[in-house]
Amino acid sequence: MGASASMFRKGKYVTEKDLDVIIDIFTKMKFYAGGKDKEKLSTGESFSISFINDNWSRKWDDDDYQWDSFDYNDNIIIYFYPKPKESHEYYIPSMGETVPSYIIFEDISGRERLLLEFLHRYFKLFPEDVFMEEYLYTKDDIDKLYAKLPWNELWAYEDPKTF
C-alpha cells in the first residue's frame, strides 16, 4: 500500500449526507461508486467505497489488458468512518483542536491529478475542512495549486507554503 491521505472537519462530525455529497462529486467527475454499505452505516462501522471511471472499466474488460497500462488517476478507494475513531485524531493548527479524520484515501500515489480535481470541487462545498497527506492543505492551498498550470504531479508531498 502506498501513501494514504485523510480529510478532517471541525465541530460536528460528518453524516451520511456528507458521504452522499462526496459520491456526487465523484459522479460529476465521471467516476462511479461501488455503493454505500447501509448496514455498516447504521452500526457506525467503517467501510470502503471504490470509485472507477469508464476508461478504467474499458481497460479492465479488455481481453488484452496489461495491469501496468492502468492510469492510477482512473480509480481510487476511500474509507468512510461514520463514527469518530481516536486512533485517527490529529491536531489541526488551522482548526485549533484535535479532530478525527472521517475519510481516508487509500494509496494516493499516482492519483494526484484525480485528487486535486476532487479536492478543488470538495472545498467549494466544505471550505473549512482540511486535507492531509504529509502536510496539511486548506481550501486556499488547493485553489492556488489548481490555478497554477501545468499541475505539479507531486503536490501532495510538498509543503503548501511553497505553492
Named regions from a protein language model:
Residues 1-4, 9, 28, 113-163:
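Acidic, proline/glycine-rich low-complexity IDRs
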Residues 1-48, 162-163:
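Short, extreme N-terminal segment that most often corresponds to the first beta-strand
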Residues 8, 104-105:
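Residues at structural and domain junctions
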Residues 16, 112-113:
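Loop/helix-junction capping segments adjacent to catalytic residues or to phosphate/diphosphate-binding pockets
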Residues 17, 63, 73, 127-128:
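Intrinsic disorder/low-complexity signal
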Residues 19-21, 92, 133, 144:
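General "foldedness" signal
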Residues 28-104:
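Short, intrinsically disordered low-complexity segments
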Residues 106-110:
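Exposed beta-sheet edge/beta-hairpin loop segments within beta-rich domains
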